C-alpha cells in the first residue's frame, strides 16, 4: 500500500492503478448513501478524474490479515482536507477491494 500512495501522490496515477486487480471493487460512502464501482476501469477512472493536486496521506495503518485499515487524510487544492476511514483488501499483491467512509 505504501507504493500505491507514493505513486498516487507523485502524480503517477496510471502506475498506481497497475497495483489493482482487474476486478477491484470500491465502495464510497457519502452521507447515508454508498456508491459501488466495479472493475479497474470504473475504480481507476475515479482516481484518474480526481483533482490533479489530490493527495492521500495514510496514518495509523492496522494490518488485519488480508485487509488493511487506514486513517486517511485526503487533501485537494482549494478544499478543506477530509479524514476518511479506509479499508483496502490486498490479495496476491493486488488491491481487490477499497472502502472509503467519512469519519
Annotate each PLM feature.
Residues 81-103:
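Short beta-strand edge/turn micro-motifs at domain boundaries
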Residues 20, 74-76, 102:
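Short beta-strand segments enriched in hydrophobic/aromatic residues
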Residues 38-81, 85:
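Surface-exposed, charged secondary-structure patches
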Residues 26, 61-63, 100:
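Hydrophobic/anchoring residues in structured secondary elements
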Residues 25-35:
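A short gly/proline-enriched turn/hairpin at secondary-structure junctions
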Amino acid at each position: 500500500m505504501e507504493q500505491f500512495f507514493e505513486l498516487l501522490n507523485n502524480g503517477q496515477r496510471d502506475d498506481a492503478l497497475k497495483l489493482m486487480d482487474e476486478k477491484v471493487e470500491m465502495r464510497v460512502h457519502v452521507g447515508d448513501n454508498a456508491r459501488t464501482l466495479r472493475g479497474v476501469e470504473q475504480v481507476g477512472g475515479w482516481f484518474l478524474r480526481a483533482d490533479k493536486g489530490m493527495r492521500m496521506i495514510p496514518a495509523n495503518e492496522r494490518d488485519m490479515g488480508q485487509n488493511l485499515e487506514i486513517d486517511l487524510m485526503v487533501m485537494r487544492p482549494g478544499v478543506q482536507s477530509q479524514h476518511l476511514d479506509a479499508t483496502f483488501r490486498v490479495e496476491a499483491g493486488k488491491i481487490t477491494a477499497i472502502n472509503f467512509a467519512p469519519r
